[in-house]
Protein backbone atom coordinates (compact mmCIF):
# COMPACT_ATOMS: atom_id res chain seq x y z
CA UNK A 1 0.00 0.00 0.00
CA UNK A 2 1.09 3.53 -0.75
CA UNK A 3 -0.02 6.84 0.76
CA UNK A 4 -1.77 9.10 -1.76
CA UNK A 5 -1.12 12.84 -1.49
CA UNK A 6 -3.77 15.44 -2.31
CA UNK A 7 -1.64 17.04 -5.02
CA UNK A 8 -1.88 13.92 -7.18
CA UNK A 9 -5.68 14.00 -7.02
CA UNK A 10 -5.71 17.72 -7.80
CA UNK A 11 -3.46 17.16 -10.82
CA UNK A 12 -5.70 14.30 -11.94
CA UNK A 13 -8.73 16.57 -11.71
CA UNK A 14 -6.98 19.56 -13.29
CA UNK A 15 -8.16 18.78 -16.79
CA UNK A 16 -4.61 19.09 -18.12
CA UNK A 17 -4.54 16.22 -20.58
CA UNK A 18 -0.91 15.18 -20.07
CA UNK A 19 -1.22 15.10 -16.26
CA UNK A 20 -4.54 13.29 -16.37
CA UNK A 21 -3.25 10.61 -18.76
CA UNK A 22 -0.05 10.03 -16.77
CA UNK A 23 -1.86 9.68 -13.46
CA UNK A 24 -4.63 7.57 -14.99
CA UNK A 25 -2.01 5.18 -16.37
CA UNK A 26 -0.26 5.06 -12.99
CA UNK A 27 -3.55 4.27 -11.22
CA UNK A 28 -4.31 1.55 -13.77
CA UNK A 29 -0.89 -0.06 -13.26
CA UNK A 30 -1.38 -0.08 -9.49
CA UNK A 31 -4.83 -1.57 -9.88
CA UNK A 32 -3.55 -4.32 -12.18
CA UNK A 33 -0.90 -5.22 -9.60
CA UNK A 34 -3.57 -5.38 -6.90
CA UNK A 35 -2.01 -2.50 -4.99
CA UNK A 36 -4.02 -0.02 -2.94
CA UNK A 37 -3.63 3.66 -2.19
CA UNK A 38 -4.22 4.79 1.38
CA UNK A 39 -6.23 8.02 1.48
CA UNK A 40 -6.24 9.57 4.97
CA UNK A 41 -9.18 11.76 5.95
CA UNK A 42 -6.90 14.81 5.72
CA UNK A 43 -6.46 14.20 1.98
CA UNK A 44 -10.22 14.26 1.47
CA UNK A 45 -10.52 17.42 3.60
CA UNK A 46 -7.80 19.14 1.56
CA UNK A 47 -9.28 17.93 -1.71
CA UNK A 48 -12.73 19.30 -0.92
CA UNK A 49 -11.27 22.60 0.30
CA UNK A 50 -9.11 23.16 -2.79
CA UNK A 51 -11.81 22.11 -5.24
CA UNK A 52 -14.30 24.48 -3.60
CA UNK A 53 -12.12 27.47 -2.80
CA UNK A 54 -9.23 27.19 -5.25
CA UNK A 55 -10.90 25.75 -8.32
CA UNK A 56 -14.41 27.13 -7.57
CA UNK A 57 -16.14 23.78 -8.18
CA UNK A 58 -19.79 23.34 -7.28
CA UNK A 59 -20.62 21.19 -4.26
CA UNK A 60 -22.48 18.65 -6.39
CA UNK A 61 -19.39 18.10 -8.54
CA UNK A 62 -17.18 17.76 -5.46
CA UNK A 63 -19.65 15.25 -4.04
CA UNK A 64 -19.40 13.16 -7.22
CA UNK A 65 -15.59 13.15 -7.10
CA UNK A 66 -15.45 12.10 -3.44
CA UNK A 67 -18.10 9.40 -3.99
CA UNK A 68 -16.06 8.07 -6.93
CA UNK A 69 -12.97 7.84 -4.71
CA UNK A 70 -14.98 6.15 -1.94
CA UNK A 71 -16.38 3.57 -4.36
CA UNK A 72 -13.14 2.78 -6.23
CA UNK A 73 -11.38 -0.37 -4.98
CA UNK A 74 -7.97 1.23 -5.64
CA UNK A 75 -8.48 3.67 -2.77
CA UNK A 76 -8.44 2.63 0.89
CA UNK A 77 -10.11 5.69 2.41
CA UNK A 78 -9.65 6.25 6.14
CA UNK A 79 -12.93 6.60 8.03
CA UNK A 80 -14.90 5.85 4.87
CA UNK A 81 -18.37 5.75 6.51
CA UNK A 82 -17.75 9.11 8.20
CA UNK A 83 -16.47 10.68 4.98
CA UNK A 84 -19.45 9.32 3.03
CA UNK A 85 -21.97 10.73 5.49
CA UNK A 86 -20.15 14.08 5.74
CA UNK A 87 -19.93 14.56 1.97
CA UNK A 88 -23.68 13.92 1.70
CA UNK A 89 -24.37 16.63 4.29
CA UNK A 90 -21.94 18.96 2.54
CA UNK A 91 -23.62 18.43 -0.82
CA UNK A 92 -26.93 19.49 0.78
CA UNK A 93 -25.32 22.77 1.87
CA UNK A 94 -25.41 21.90 5.55
CA UNK A 95 -22.05 23.59 6.24
CA UNK A 96 -18.39 23.37 5.37
CA UNK A 97 -17.09 19.89 4.70
CA UNK A 98 -14.96 20.05 7.85
CA UNK A 99 -17.95 21.08 9.99
CA UNK A 100 -19.99 18.27 8.42
CA UNK A 101 -17.24 15.75 9.22
CA UNK A 102 -16.95 17.00 12.81
CA UNK A 103 -20.71 16.75 13.23
CA UNK A 104 -20.82 13.19 11.90
CA UNK A 105 -18.11 12.13 14.34
CA UNK A 106 -19.81 13.93 17.24
CA UNK A 107 -23.20 12.38 16.50
CA UNK A 108 -21.63 8.90 16.41
CA UNK A 109 -20.37 9.61 19.94
CA UNK A 110 -23.79 10.79 21.11
CA UNK A 111 -22.77 14.43 21.42
CA UNK A 112 -25.63 16.91 21.12
CA UNK A 113 -23.96 20.22 22.02
CA UNK A 114 -21.10 22.10 20.41
CA UNK A 115 -19.00 24.72 22.18
CA UNK A 116 -18.52 27.34 19.49
CA UNK A 117 -18.73 31.08 18.88
CA UNK A 118 -20.70 30.64 15.68
CA UNK A 119 -24.17 29.33 15.07
CA UNK A 120 -23.28 27.21 12.04
CA UNK A 121 -23.63 23.91 13.90
CA UNK A 122 -27.35 24.59 14.48
CA UNK A 123 -27.92 23.74 10.80
CA UNK A 124 -26.33 20.37 11.57
CA UNK A 125 -28.72 19.66 14.44
CA UNK A 126 -26.63 20.69 17.44
CA UNK A 127 -27.29 23.00 20.35
CA UNK A 128 -24.56 25.64 20.38
CA UNK A 129 -22.93 26.71 23.64
CA UNK A 130 -21.05 30.01 23.46
CA UNK A 131 -18.56 30.41 26.33
CA UNK A 132 -19.07 34.22 26.28
CA UNK A 133 -22.81 33.95 26.79
CA UNK A 134 -24.57 32.95 29.98
CA UNK A 135 -25.50 29.29 30.28
Curated annotation (Swiss-Prot):
Mg(2+) binds at residue 5. Keywords: Hydrolase, Magnesium, Metal-binding, Nuclease, Toxin-antitoxin system. The keyword Metal-binding applies. InterPro entries: PIN-like_dom_sf, PIN_dom. The keyword RNA-binding does not apply. Its EC number is 3.1.-.-. Pfam families: PIN. It comes from the Bacteria. It is an enzyme of class 3 (hydrolase). One of its GO terms (molecular function) is metal ion binding. Residues 3-130 form the PINc domain. Its cofactor is Mg(2+). Toxic component of a type II toxin-antitoxin (TA) system. An RNase. Belongs to the PINc/VapC protein family. This is VapC ribonuclease aq_1901. It comes from Aquifex aeolicus (strain VF5). The lineage of its organism: Bacteria, Pseudomonadati, Aquificota, Aquificia, Aquificales.
Amino acid sequence: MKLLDTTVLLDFLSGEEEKVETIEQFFEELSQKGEKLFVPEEVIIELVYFLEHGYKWEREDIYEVVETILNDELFNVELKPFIREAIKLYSKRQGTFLDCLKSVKAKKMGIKEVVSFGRRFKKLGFKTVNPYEES
